[in-house]
Amino acid sequence: MKIFNYKRVPYAEIRAFSVHILTASGSFLAFLGVVAASEHRFVDMFWWLGLALLVDGIDGPIARKVRVKEVLPNWSGDTLDNIIDYVTYVLLPAFALYQSGMIGEPLSFVAAGMIVVSSAIYYADMGMKTDEYFFSGFPVVWNMVVFTLFVMDASATTAMTVVTVSVFLTFLPINFLHPVRVKRLRPLNLLVVAIWCALGGYALLMHFETPTWAVIAFVASGIYLYCIGGILQFFPSLGAK
C-alpha cells in the first residue's frame, strides 16, 4: 500500500492558488512601504512600491497561463487585485504625499482626501476600460503621479494643481493609456515606459538628488504616458493598422 499517492495531489489547484498568494504579497509590500513612509524614508517606500508594481505586472499573465479563474472559480482574482491596487496605487501614495509636507497643512489633508475618495469611487466603475483597453478617466495611478512629484521636487502649488486636475479627470470620459494592452503605438509606448522606469530607478539610487537632465527626461516621459491616451482618442487613425 502506498503511503503517498502523488496522483491525488491537486497540483492544478495548488499552482492556481499560489498565484493568488503572489498577488496578495503586494499587501505586505505595501505595509513595508507604510512603515518606511511613516519614518520619512521615502526612497525606501518607493522601492517597495516599485516591487509591488512588478508583482502587479506579472501576476495577471501568470494567472491567465495557469487558468486560475477556471481552476478556482470561487476565488476572485479581480477582487483581490483591486484590493491590492487600491492600497499600493492610492492609499500609500496619498499617505506619502501627506507625510512629506510637500503641500503643507491644511491642504495636504484636502489633497489626500480627494485622492482616496475619488479613487474608491473609480474602482467601483464597471466601465473603466474601453474596447481598445484604454482606461476611461484618469486610472488613479497615484503611485506614478506622486513619485513624479517627488522626483521633480514639486512646489506646493504644482503638487496641488496636479492632484486637483487628476482627480477631475478621473470622472471625465478621456482615455488614458494601458501601455501593455493597448495595441496602437505599443512599441513606442513600451519604450517610453522603460525609459520612465529606468530614470525613476536612477532617481531613487540618487536619493532624489537627480541631475536636471534626468528630471526633465523623466517628467517628459511621464507627460507622454499621461497624455497619449487622450491624443489617440481624438486622433483615432493615429497608430492604427
Curated annotation (Swiss-Prot):
Highest taxon of source: Bacteria
Example GO biological process: phospholipid biosynthetic process
Membrane side Periplasmic: residue ranges: 37-41, 98-100, 155-159, 209-214
Cytoplasmic side: 1-15, 63-76, 122-133, 181-187, 236-241
Keywords: Cell inner membrane, Cell membrane, Lipid biosynthesis, Lipid metabolism, Manganese, Membrane, Phospholipid biosynthesis, Phospholipid metabolism, Transferase, Transmembrane, Transmembrane helix
Keyword Plastid: no
Enzyme Commission identifier(s): 2.7.8.24
Cofactors named for this entry: Mn(2+)
Cellular component per GO, a single term: plasma membrane
Chief location of this protein within or outside the cell: membrane
Subcellular location: Cell inner membrane
Catalytic activity: a CDP-1,2-diacyl-sn-glycerol + choline = a 1,2-diacyl-sn-glycero-3-phosphocholine + CMP + H(+)
Protein purpose: Condenses choline with CDP-diglyceride to produce phosphatidylcholine and CMP. Affects motility, biofilm formation and virulence of this bacterium when there is a complete loss of phosphatidylcholine formation due to absence of both the synthase (pcs) and the methylation (pmtA) pathways.
Family: Belongs to the CDP-alcohol phosphatidyltransferase class-I family.
Protein name stated in the entry: Phosphatidylcholine synthase
